[in-house]
Amino acid sequence: MKKLKTKVRSPGSATIINAISTGCGSAFGIQLYVKAEVQLKQGTEIECTSDQKVDSTLMEICAKNILNKLKINTGVKIHIQSNLPVASGLSSSSAVSNAVTMALTYALTDEYQINPKEVGLDDDGILNMAVDSSLEAGVTITGAYDDASASYYGGISITNNLKREIIRNENWNGQNILIYMPDKKSPTAEADVARMKLLAPWVKLAFHEVLKGNIHHALTLNGLLYCSALRFNPDIALDALEAGAVAAGLSGTGPSFVALTDDKNLSKVEDVWNSYPGRVILTKVDNQGTQVIASE
């Protein structure tokens, strides 16, 4: 056994359209990352560690599913590093699933000289395995195919989550992205699905906007709708818009809010959000997606 370390970096994503109410969604990659380091070892133990409170169950399920897919029995050591906040509405679970699934796929197919495409583990196959693992771990309601595909491929992803179909994926050079992080967590699996389903007719309107390319309108309308359903304070988004943001709203099922702003109004929006308890993060769109960064 070569005992190589395979390292993969996977970005989080922010919401344009939350898919929970209708099954169709949209998200874009952001430059906050999960890094997974995978090393094969003797035995059959799956050993998982992280520098954040990442769910080890999700990591173990990702590993187990790839090992079963390839019909390989071996020990695996997985370590996660991350500057992507967990349970925050920024697709941390999708990023972990993508990073671990890709890293272990590459490590195993290299060690055992397997062609990934011949066993159904091309990019689409890896992404689907990652989504399956997230569903099995119970960290997502719909599989979050919109979030997962934005994290995997980068840029903006528009999807039908129920069909696991990418309607459109493209690079996006958007404005500055500000993320407001309150001092609390909000796991997606604990969100009130029934209340979100009530939003379906209006979320469909927002989804049509994103299909037409009206990203700012779609993000804001979606974000305000889900604020209402999930009882988050819409003033957080409205204050950002009043300060000059071109779009603002809740990301995922919260508690994070995302705002898009040009350079001129960046400091104004940042100042407004800094008046709330919590922290504000400045980032950009990630157009690269999930990728191997080292194999050593």
Regions found by a protein language model. Name each.
Residues 64-65, 101-110, 157, 208, ...:
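Short glycine/serine- and small hydrophobic-enriched flexible loop segments
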Residues 90-119, 123, 154:
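DPxDG-like acidic metal-binding loop motif
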Residues 124-166:
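Alpha/beta catalytic cores of group-transfer enzymes, especially the acyltransferase/condensing modules
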Residues 211-296:
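Glycine-rich, charge-dense phosphate/pyrophosphate-binding loop(s)
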Residues 1-88, 272, 285-296:
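ATP-binding N-lobe of GHMP and related small-molecule kinases
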Residues 40, 182, 259-263:
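Short beta-strand-to-loop capping motifs
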Residues 171-232, 238:
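Acyltransferase
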Residues 77-80, 114-133, 220-221:
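Beta-strand segments within the central parallel beta-sheet cores of soluble alpha/beta enzyme folds
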